[in-house]
Amino acid sequence: MSVNEQKAPELQEKLVQVNRVAKVVKGGRIFAFTALTVVGDGKGRVGFGRGKAREVPVAIQKAMEAARKNMVDVALDGTTLQYPVRAQHGGSKVFMQPASEGTGIIAGGAMRAVLEVAGVQNVLSKCYGSTNPVNVVRSTIKGLQAMKAPEDVAAKRGKSVEDILG
């Protein structure tokens, strides 16, 4: 049994988008489906994947496998973010801000799916520019990945956490 198969039961999987695409050939059109999925353990690990196939279930399965292989760690502060963060990918710009307990996930569409599977429970967020789900997912993960824990920053600078936090 591989590592991915052992972790599979505890992973949360969300389907973000299914899109039908067409290849035009001499005899007509050939249709295929693309799927965008996000996978996370709810404890600070999240990944996304894309799959393409002639049938929807196969495309979703391929996307889930790609998402499991593509997981990254996110430094969370309990159920929220460490500090406000901005990120951009392509035309999509996202802004995410920590929120107090009980606020919930204030985010839309693709960004909400990423935050839910990552284990974030309280966050204020906004997406600017393009709302293309692929770019929103990429920029959200890029922003989450860019956050560093105070312990990491303190160790890198050779100072204590109290000096860093003021």
Swiss-Prot record:
A single MF term (Gene Ontology): rRNA binding
One of the GO BP terms on file: translation
Domain S5 DRBM, first and last residues per copy: 11-74
Any GO CC annotation of this UniProt entry: small ribosomal subunit
Keyword annotations of the record: Ribonucleoprotein, Ribosomal protein, RNA-binding, rRNA-binding
Short name of one Pfam family: Ribosomal_S5_C
Gene3D superfamilies linked: 3.30.160.20, 3.30.230.10
Role noted for this protein: With S4 and S12 plays an important role in translational accuracy.
Domains: entry comment: The N-terminal domain interacts with the head of the 30S subunit; the C-terminal domain interacts with the body and contacts protein S4. The interaction surface between S4 and S5 is involved in control of translational fidelity.
Record-linked HAMAP family: Ribosomal_uS5_B
Membership in a protein family: Belongs to the universal ribosomal protein uS5 family.
Subunit structure: Part of the 30S ribosomal subunit. Contacts proteins S4 and S8.
Protein name, per record: Small ribosomal subunit protein uS5
Species in which this protein is naturally found: Marinobacter nauticus (strain ATCC 700491 / DSM 11845 / VT8)
Lineage, top ranks: Bacteria, Pseudomonadati, Pseudomonadota, Gammaproteobacteria, Pseudomonadales
